[in-house]
Amino acid sequence: LVSLLFAGTALAQEHNPGSVQPDTIQKSSEKSFRKQRSPRTDHGPVGINISLWKNISTQRTDTIGSTCFNLGVFSSMNRLNGLGMNILGSVTGRDVNGVQMAGLSNMVGGSMRGMQIAGITNINGNNLIGVSVSGLVGITGNHAQGVIISGLANISGDYNRGASIGGLLNISGEGASGIHFAGLANISGGNFKGFSGAGLLSVIGEDLNGMQMSALTNITAGDMTGVQVSGLGNVVGGTARGLQIGAANMAIRAKGLQIGLFNYYKEKLDGFQLGLVNANPQTKVQLMFFGGNATKLNVGARFKNRLFYT
């Protein structure tokens, strides 16, 4: 009987050369299903989230849905496209497009486009485009563009473009541009274009195009094109093009004007130094001894730069 079955199968395949094996049919149907299946989208159903706590709400937390209106004590959502208001805070797994307000904190895993207001902190895992106001700290993982105001510190992992106002600190991991005010310090890891004003310290990791102003010290590791004004010192690690005003001004190369008690350049000066002591590696220090009616002996020093003494 088994032999007859095998023989019948062989004859059927010979008379039907277009027939295919069952596994071939299954693979073909799977390919056809893949072609017919619509591409996956992250934009799922839209709903209203009235929430007391995570998973105690009118909208369950998933990975595809989005929320158009959120009101609660503490809320957890996938995506917010609209308005969210919470007494304590909210956690959004992906992006926010709209307005978020919370008594304590707003946390967004993706990008924020719109306005955030929180009593303590706003945290965005990716980018921020818009306005962020927090009582203590505003944190953006990558780019921040817009207006950021925090009572303590604003921190951007990458580029910061716009107006950043921090009670103590503004920190940008890469470059920054715009207007930065801080009660203590402005720190930019890359280039800075614009105005940086700090109560104590302003530090730029690469080049400055604009103005630095601080009560204590301005430091630019690369070139400076613009103006530096400080109560104690201005330091430029490359070429200073423009104006330096401070108790001490130092640059590798100076092209412009240095005004201070002590002015120094290392390699080249194309400009003018106005100060009590103007120095460079070629400056000659000459000691002077002299006497008078009031004092029998006086000792002084003068610094000679080419044809000028200070």
Predicted stretch roles:
Residues 1-19:
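Bacterial Sec-dependent N-terminal signal peptides
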Residues 17-310:
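Surface-exposed, glycine- and small/polar-enriched segments that build interaction surfaces at terminal
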